[in-house]
Curated annotation (Swiss-Prot):
Associates with and regulates the activity of the sodium/potassium-transporting ATPase (NKA) which catalyzes the hydrolysis of ATP coupled with the exchange of Na(+) and K(+) ions across the plasma membrane. Increases the apparent affinity of the transporter for Na(+) and increases NKA activity. One of its GO terms (cellular component) is basolateral plasma membrane. The gene is Fxyd4. Induction: By corticosteroids. One of its GO terms (molecular function) is ATPase binding. Belongs to the FXYD family. It comes from Rattus norvegicus. Keywords: Cell membrane, Ion transport, Membrane, Potassium, Potassium transport, Signal, Sodium, Sodium transport, Sodium/potassium transport, Transmembrane, Transmembrane helix, Transport. This is FXYD domain-containing ion transport regulator 4. The chain crosses the membrane at residues 36-57.
Length: 87
């Protein structure tokens, strides 16, 4: 029964391929100009990269290195002591 269901779902998934138009149908709402889309993505990515490098080198986002270390207690009490854990 499981094999029949799987085969039926595969046939249903493949049915739209039979009615699909070729990729040259420029009037289709699902036609994309992939070259322009890729070029726009590369330009956008390059601008983001340049902006990130400029922000990192500008010194506006400084990590403050002169923090005073937090005072920790000298002796830390363990949460689980030997023999306190039950199995």
């Amino acid at each position: 029964m499981e094999g029949i269901t799987c085969a039926f779902l595969l046939v249903l998934a493949g049915l739209p391929v039979l009615e699909a138009n070729g990729p040259v149908d420029k009037g289709s709402p699902f036609y994309y100009d992939w070259e322009s889309l890729q070029l726009g993505g590369m330009i956008f990515g390059g601008l983001l990269c340049i902006a990130g490098i400029a922000m990192a080198l500008s010194g506006k986002c400084k990590c403050r290195r002169n923090h005073t270390p937090s005072s920790l207690p000298e002796k830390v009490t363990p949460l689980i002591t030997p023999g306190s854990a039950s199995t």
